[in-house]
Regions:
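Conserved catalytic motifs of ABC-family nucleotide-binding domains
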Residues: 98-99, 111-121, 135
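Short, conserved post-Walker A segment of ABC-type ATPase nucleotide-binding domains
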Residues: 58, 69-82
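Alpha-helical transmembrane segments and their short interhelical loops
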Residues: 210, 218-225, 230-233, 239-242, ...
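Topological signature of polytopic alpha-helical transporters
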Residues: 1-56, 63-64, 88, 93, ...
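Conserved ABC transporter NBD signature motif
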Residues: 51, 77, 84-100, 163-165
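Helix N-cap at the start of a conserved alpha-helix in ABC-type nucleotide-binding domains
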Residues: 202-203
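Catalytic Walker B motif of ABC-type/P-loop ATPase nucleotide-binding domains
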Residues: 191-195
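ABC ATPase C-loop
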Residues: 183-184
Length: 592
C-alpha cells in the first residue's frame, strides 16, 4: 500500500460518525499452487471493482463464488496485498495501513469462541487484550463488558458456557451475538462481517440483522457479505453492492435496485422477494427483454457491462476521481507491523490464563488423558511385573513406549505459540508421561535408584515432546485435518522402522543406515537401553552377559556422554520442529 503525508494512524481513522470507505479499480488475483508449485495462470477474483460505502447498513450480496467475501477481505485489509494488482482502498479519503485491522472490527463467518468459557469470560478476554491497561482499569473493562452484554441482549446467558461437542451451551444466535460483542469491545466505527446469518434460522437471522441495523443507526459503518436474505432482512439495507463473477453489477441505494433492474427490462414476479429476484437475474433464471438476450450473447458478463454504462456508475466514478486526487502520486511506503495495545508479557499472562482454564474445564484434554496414562501404566506394569533378568524378557523393553499431540489483533503470533507450549503442550504431555513413568517404572522392577528413574522419565518426556513438536509442525503447515493426519502418520511409521523397534540397525543395508539419525525413537530407545542395561547382568542358559556387552552388540555408546548425546539430540529435534512450526505460523497467520 502507498503511504505518505496522507497516511493516517490508528487514532485518526474514525471520527464520531462512521467512516466512508472508497475503493477504485480493484484487480485481485490468486495463483493456484500444488505441492508448493505454481500451476496454471493466475485466477482473477476481483475485476475492476469500484465503490463508495458510507455509514449505515452496507450489504455485499452475490451467489457462491461471486467474490463478495474476497471484496470484504480486501476492504478490511485481510487479503495478501501481493495479490492486489491494481487499485486502492481509502478510509475517509486517506490511505490506510495494517493498523486498520486493530482499529476496525471483523466478525468471521464461523464463530471463533472458546467453548469452555462463558459468554462473559469470552468478552472479558477480548477486553483484556484490546483495551489498553493504562487507559482502562479492571473496573472499566468489566463495565464495558456489562454494557455489551446488555446492548446485545445476552443478559440471560451471560454466565452460560458457549458449549462444545461434549458440553451443551448457548444457542446459535447467542453465539453469533457473542462473536459480534467480542469485536465491539473497542467501540469501532467500522464493522466488517462475513455472512453473519449463515447457519441461523430465519428468526435468529432477522434478529442479528436487526442488531446490526441498530448499531448502524448509532453512526457506525457496517459492511457485511450475505447470500440470499429474506425480505424482512433486505428492507433494512441502506446500500447494496451486487456481485457476479468477481464484478459489480449494481452498487447503490438498496431501495433503488429494483427500479434499476426493471429499467433494464427485467420483470419481477408479483409478491417475489427482491433479493431472490436479483439472485435470479445474476444466475440467468429470470425473464428479460430481447435486447438483453442479445447482449448476453455478445459478452461474458452483460450485467457488469450494463452497470458500467449506467449514469449511476458514471456519477460514482466522478466522485471517486475527486477523492483520489488527494492521494500523493509516486509516494510509496512499507506496511509497518501493527502496534498492539497491550505488551507482550501482558498478552502472555492473559492467553496462558485462558489456555489453562480451558484445559481444566475440558476433561477430554486433561482428566481423561491423565486417566488413560494411569490405566496403561498399570497395564504395562502388570504385564512386566517385577521382570526377571533373563535375556529374552529383558530385550522386550521396546514393547512399552508411549507417545502422544490459530488475528484480529488480539495478540502476537509469538504469544499464541509460547502460550500453546507452556500452558498447553508441556502440561498435557509431561504430566501424564511422568505419572505413567512413576507407576510403570517400579511395577516393572527396573533399577530402583531414583536417579535412573529420573533419567527414564526425562527420556520419555522428551520423546513425547519431540513427537508433539513434529505434529505441531505438520499441523501448522497444512490447512485440513485429513491432510495433517496423513502427513503425521508417515514420518512416525518411517521413524519406527528405522528406530530399532522392528529391525536390528546393524543388520540394515549400509546405504540406508543414515536414516536412523533422524528417528525420534532411535534416540529415545538408545537412552533407555543405556539407562537400564549399563551395569546390569543378564542371565541365559547358565550364561551371564553384561549389559555393556549387549549395548556394544547394538552399536550403542554407553558412556556418560553416550546417554546425554541422545538427550541433546531429542532436544535438538524439539527445538528445530518448534522453530519451523513458528515460522509456518508467521507465514500463514496474517493472510489465511
Amino acid at each position: 500500500m502507498t503511504k505518505g503525508e496522507n497516511s493516517i494512524g490508528v487514532d485518526d481513522y474514525f471520527q464520531d460518525r462512521g467512516p466512508t470507505v472508497t475503493f477504485s479499480n480493484l484487480l485481485y488475483c490468486v495463483q493456484e499452487t500444488k505441492f508448493c508449485r505454481k500451476i496454471g495462470p493466475e485466477k482473477i477474483i476481483l475485476h475492476d471493482v469500484s465503490g463508495i460505502i458510507r455509514p449505515g447498513m452496507n450489504a455485499i450480496m452475490g451467489a457462491t463464488g461471486s467474490g463478495k467475501t474476497s471484496l470484504l477481505d480486501v476492504l478490511a485489509g485481510r487479503k495478501n496485498p501481493a495479490g492486489l494488482r491494481q487499485g486502492n482502498v481509502l478510509v475517509n479519503g486517506k490511505v490506510v495501513t495494517s493498523d486498520l485491522r486493530l482499529s476496525s472490527a471483523y466478525v468471521v463467518q464461523d464463530d471463533i469462541l472458546m467453548g469452555t468459557l462463558s459468554v462473559r469470560e469470552n468478552l472479558l478476554f477480548s477486553a483484556n487484550l484490546r483495551l489498553n491497561p493504562k487507559d482502562h482499569s479492571t473496573a472499566d473493562k468489566h463495565q464495558q463488558v456489562n454494557t455489551i452484554i446488555e446492548d446485545l441482549g445476552l443478559t440471560d446467558c451471560a454466565n452460560t458456557k458457549i458449549g462444545t461437542e461434549f458440553l451443551r451451551g448457548v444457542s446459535g444466535g447467542e453465539r453469533k451475538r457473542c462473536s459480534i460483542g467480542m469485536e465491539l469491545i473497542t467501540s469501532p466505527s467500522l464493522l466488517f462481517l462475513d455472512e453473519p446469518t449463515t447457519g441461523l434460522d430465519s428468526n435468529t437471522a432477522n434478529c442479528i440483522i436487526g442488531l446490526l441495523h441498530k448499531l448502524s443507526r448509532r453512526g457506525k459503518t457496517v459492511i457485511f457479505s450475505i447470500h440470499q436474505p429474506r425480505y424482512s432482512i433486505f428492507k433494512q439495507f441502506d446500500h447494496l453492492t451486487l456481485m457476479h463473477k468477481g464484478e459489480v453489477v449494481y452498487a447503490g441505494a438498496a431501495d433503488h435496485a429494483l427500479m434499476y433492474f426493471t429499467d433494464l427490462g427485467y420483470q419481477i414476479e408479483p409478491f417475489n422477494n427482491p433479493a431472490d429476484f436479483f439472485m435470479d437475474i445474476t444466475n440467468g433464471e429470470t425473464k428479460s427483454t430481447p435486447h438483453l438476450l442479445q447482449t448476453k450473447l455478445n459478452c461474458k458478463n452483460p450485467l457488469a457491462i450494463k452497470y458500467q454504462q449506467s449514469q449511476l456508475y458514471q456519477n460514482m466514478m466522478e466522485e471517486l476521481d475527486h477523492v483520489n486526487q488527494s492521494i500523493v502520486d509516486g509516494v510509496t511506503g512499507e506496511d509497518k507491523p501493527a502496534n498492539y495495545t497491550t505488551s507482550f508479557f501482558y498478552q502472555m499472562r492473559v492467553v496462558c490464563g485462558r489456555t489453562v482454564l480451558n484445559t481444566l474445564r475440558n476433561p477430554q484434554t486433561s482428566y481423561a488423558q491423565l486417566a488413560l496414562n494411569i490405566f496403561f501404566a498399570i497395564l504395562v506394569g502388570l504385564i512386566y511385573y517385577q521382570m526377571p533378568l533373563t535375556l529374552p524378557e529383558a530385550l522386550q523393553n521396546s514393547l512399552f513406549f508411549k507417545f502422544h499431540e490459530n488475528s484480529s489483533g488480539y495478540y502476537r503470533t509469538s504469544v499464541y505459540f509460547l502460550s500453546k507450549i507452556f500452558a498447553d503442550l508441556i502440561p498435557n504431555r509431561m504430566i501424564p508421561i511422568i505419572v505413567f513413568s512413576a507407576i510403570a517404572y517400579y511395577m516393572m522392577g527396573l533399577k530402583p535408584a531414583f536417579e535412573t528413574f529420573l533419567c527414564f522419565a526425562l527420556t520419555m518426556s522428551l520423546v513425547s515432546l519431540a513427537g508433539v513438536g513434529l505434529a505441531f509442525l505438520v499441523s501448522a503447515s497444512v490447512s485440513t485435518f485429513a491432510m495433517a493426519n496423513i502427513l503425521i502418520a508417515l514420518p512416525f511409521v518411517f521413524m519406527m522402522v528405522f528406530g530399532g523397534f522392528l529391525v536390528n540397525l546393524n543388520a540394515m543395508l549400509s546405504w540406508l543406515s543414515w536414516v536412523k539419525w533422524i528417528s525420534i525413537f532411535k534416540y529415545g530407545l538408545d537412552a533407555l537401553y543405556i539407562n537400564e542395561l549399563k551395569g546390569l547382568f543378564l542371565y541365559s542358559n547358565n550364561t551371564t552377559i553384561s549389559g555393556e556387552y549387549f549395548l556394544e552388540q547394538q552399536g550403542i555408546d554407553y558412556s556418560v556422554w553416550g546417554f546425554w548425546r541422545n538427550v541433546v539430540a531429542l532436544l535438538g529435534i524439539i527445538f528445530v520442529c518448534m522453530c519451523l512450526a513458528y515460522v509456518q505460523l508467521r507465514r500463514i497467520n496474517r493472510w489465511k
